[in-house]
UniProtKB/Swiss-Prot annotation:
Keyword Transferase appears in the UniProt entry: yes
Domain MGS-like, residue spans: 1-157
Record protein name field: Bifunctional purine biosynthesis protein PurH
UniProt record similarity statement: Belongs to the PurH family.
SMART domains given in the database record: AICARFT_IMPCHas, MGS
GO CC field: cytosol
Enzyme Commission designation: 2.1.2.3, 3.5.4.10
Organism: Thermodesulfovibrio yellowstonii (strain ATCC 51303 / DSM 11347 / YP87)
Reaction catalysis annotation: (6R)-10-formyltetrahydrofolate + 5-amino-1-(5-phospho-beta-D-ribosyl)imidazole-4-carboxamide = 5-formamido-1-(5-phospho-D-ribosyl)imidazole-4-carboxamide + (6S)-5,6,7,8-tetrahydrofolate; IMP + H2O = 5-formamido-1-(5-phospho-D-ribosyl)imidazole-4-carboxamide
Domain notes: The IMP cyclohydrolase activity resides in the N-terminal region.
Length: 522
């Protein structure tokens, strides 16, 4: 039977109705600060914790519930003779229910971090002071104590659990199985809360790879399935900005596991460019990329790169989608269109394709710099690395052949190099002016990628340029490229046979640039 409950919450959703039900059941309610005021204003009888303990709130509310009368009443084991004797001797009464949710540190941290990523002269100390005042101490202590003693204490951290708990109490009792599930939820919640704090401190003062690292993940929803229908899946969010998870889904079916993977890849590639760009992705690799004077021309060029592979793909734009572009897009089946926004006329066009997912992601109009680290799951752990981003990348580039690239070739080389970074290794990109024309993707041999990229081309490769994400180990790659009419190459260099490769390029009068930077992607 529930005789006494302690309630102290920041999130007051459903609070009053829940407390009224407890009041009707004759439960004595202890509370603090703003929660107590909310309950009293609603006509609910409340005892202040300070009155209950005989000790006032101190230090601007930093110390409110940290008292033996509170924690003894929570932690006492009802079936332990020594605990019961201690309660009787010290005048400690049992607390049977604890309802607590925590100061809104997460929202404060997210607000700060979204600003820290932009200006460089912000007052971090002012941010830190505000964040520190939103670090809850008493709340997690109450929750952890209650969850530890879940057999005797009902602990509620989620307002969504209020109604089911009331129903169970009215039926007679809350089962031990349900109490255990509530305790599990608490420990996950408090662990994430501490992880959010550690993550925030690290981001405002980075120290590289940490010895101990807990990711503050929160499930936003379950997904229909994973990569395949037999795999269960869910979507988890980090407290980061920008976040693809926060993108507005304007229409269409729910995003799938594969949709998110492909959209992520498309977004990262699209934000490499300041010019209007269209990126079409299929199975986590681009199949067409182009820049243009506007996104309509960019889309037409990107689509022409590989119309067959584009079917069922994902499109990313870094400009607002207009009616003209939308009218062109609906002629082909796509899974997702992601853009900074869609104008009203474009949305009306897309209404004819009800299942097509439209994602509004305003950050796409900017150069996105992913925060934190890039993680990849392996058996037993993670491998962690910095994101693949290099400032002033072309400042290290040098021409290693007799012939210099022309201005037009330089432009195409830089375009192809940006695309190549986002293709599975071994990657070879054939490009002409401002578009891809052939993509050699994910082959175990670089010369195979060179051959497959040429096979995919739907137009003549004469006068094209090529980008390779890794060095050419043998001259056979240059022979293949020359046979297909390539006039200029950009690659990292670094092979023991670099001179052999350079000599081959000179033989064919091909201009070649070494960047000194590799862009493998696995």
């Amino acid at each position: 039977m529930i005789k006494r409950a302690l309630i102290s919450v920041s999130d007051k959703r459903g609070l009053v109705d829940f407390a009224k039900e407890l009041d009707k059941l004759g439960v004595e309610i202890l509370s603090t600060g703003g929660t107590a005021k909310t309950l009293r204003d609603s006509g609910i009888k409340v005892i202040d914790v300070s009155q209950y303990t005989g000790f006032p709130e101190i230090m601007d509310g930093r110390v409110k519930t940290l008292h033996p009368l509170i924690h003894g009443g929570i932690l006492a084991r009802r079936d332990n003779k020594e605990d019961i004797e201690a309660m009787e001797r010290l005048g400690i009464k049992p607390i049977d229910m604890v309802v607590v949710n925590l100061y809104p540190f997460e929202s404060v941290a997210k607000k700060h971090l979204s600003q820290i990523l932009q200006p460089s002269d912000l007052n971090l100390q002012a941010f830190l002071e505000e964040a520190i005042e939103n670090i809850d101490i008493g709340g997690p202590t109450l929750l952890r104590a209650s969850a530890k003693n879940y057999k005797d204490v009902i602990v509620i951290v989620d307002p969504d659990d209020y109604s089911s708990i009331i129903e169970d109490i009215k039926k007679g009792s809350v089962s031990i199985e349900k109490k255990f599930e509530l305790a599990k939820k608490v420990f996950s919640h408090t662990a994430r809360y501490d992880a959010l704090i550690a993550d925030y401190f690290e981001k405002i003062s980075p120290s590289g790879f940490k010895k101990d690292w807990t990711l503050p993940l929160k499930m936003t929803r379950t997904l229909r399935y994973g990569e395949n229908p037999h795999q269960k899946a869910a979507l988890y969010a980090l407290n980061e900005s920008p976040s693809l998870i926060d993108a507005d889904v304007l229409q269409g079916k729910e995003m799938s596991f594969n949709n998110y993977l492909d959209t992520h890849s498309a977004v990262l590639l699209a934000t490499e460019f300041s010019e209007p760009v269209c990126v079409i992705v299929k199975h986590n690799n681009p199949c067409g990329v182009a820049i243009g004077e506007n996104i309509h021309t960019a889309y037409k060029k990107a689509f022409e790169c590989d119309p067959v592979s584009a079917f069922g793909g994902i499109i990313a734009f870094n400009r607002v989608v207009d009616k003209e572009t939308a009218s062109e897009i609906i002629n082909t089946f796509y899974e997702v269109i992601v853009a900074p926004d869609f104008d009203k006329d474009a949305l009306e066009v897309f209404e004819t394709k009800k299942n097509l997912r439209l994602l509004r992601f305003p950050s796409l109009s900017d150069k996105i710099q992913p925060s934190g680290f890039d993680l990849k799951r392996i058996l037993g752990g993670f491998i962690v690395q910095e994101w693949d981003k290099v400032d002033n990348e072309f400042s290290q580039a040098k021409v290693v052949t007799k012939r210099q690239p022309t201005d037009e070739e330089w432009k195409a080389l830089k375009f192809a190099w940006k695309v190549c970074k986002h293709i599975k290794s071994n990657a070879v990109v054939y490009a002409k002016e401002d578009r891809t024309v052939g993509l050699g993707i994910g082959q175990t041999s670089r010369v195979f990628s060179a051959k497959i990229g040429a096979m995919h081309a739907l137009s003549s490769l004469k006068g094209t340029v090529v980008a390779s994400d890794g060095f050419f180990p043998f001259r056979d790659n240059i022979d293949v490229l020359a046979q297909n009419g390539v006039t200029s190459i950009i690659q990292p260099g670094g092979s023991v046979r670099d001179q052999e490769v350079i000599d081959a390029a000179n033989q064919y009068n091909i201009a070649m640039v070494f960047t000194g930077i590799r862009h493998f992607r696995h």
